[in-house]
């Protein structure tokens, strides 16, 4: 009998395919400084609106960014998206340009934007979403 023969009743090596939509989240950390200030408004308005966050010298944060992709796992890999690939996308689109930078002054894609949490989410989404390969969706 050849060494590669299968035992009687043994199952094939083809994996079972599970179906359904899943959500997979990756977290990344970065540090950055920013200033909340609307140049179209007065200094007094900015100080009332943003308080210490309007400090002319800015202030810093330790950011935690969570990115979730949605989709059905690929039957061949079991992945919605290889998390290593998502990590590379986040490194290239967010961490490399933003980590240890002044978001108002040093990050080109944030210039002219008030870097509130809400605006950062929108700006980051705009950079990450086009990089996520289908069928995964941000």
Task: Give the residues covered by each predicted segment.
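Charge-rich, low-complexity N-terminal segments
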Residues: 2-138
């Amino acid at each position: 009998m050849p060494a590669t023969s299968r035992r009687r009743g043994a199952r094939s090596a083809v994996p079972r395919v599970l179906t359904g939509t899943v959500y997979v989240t990756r977290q990344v950390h970065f540090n950055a400084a920013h200033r909340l200030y609307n140049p179209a408004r007065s200094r007094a308005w900015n100080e009332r609106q943003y308080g210490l966050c309007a400090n002319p010298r800015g202030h810093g944060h330790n950011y935690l960014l969570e990115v979730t992709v949605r989709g059905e796992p690929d039957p061949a890999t079991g992945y919605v998206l290889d998390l290593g690939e998502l990590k590379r996308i986040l490194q290239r689109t967010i961490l490399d340009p933003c980590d240890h930078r002044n978001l108002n002054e040093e990050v080109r894609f944030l210039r002219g934007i008030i870097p509130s949490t809400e605006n950062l989410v929108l700006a980051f989404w705009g950079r990450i979403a086009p990089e996520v390969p289908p069928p995964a969706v941000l």
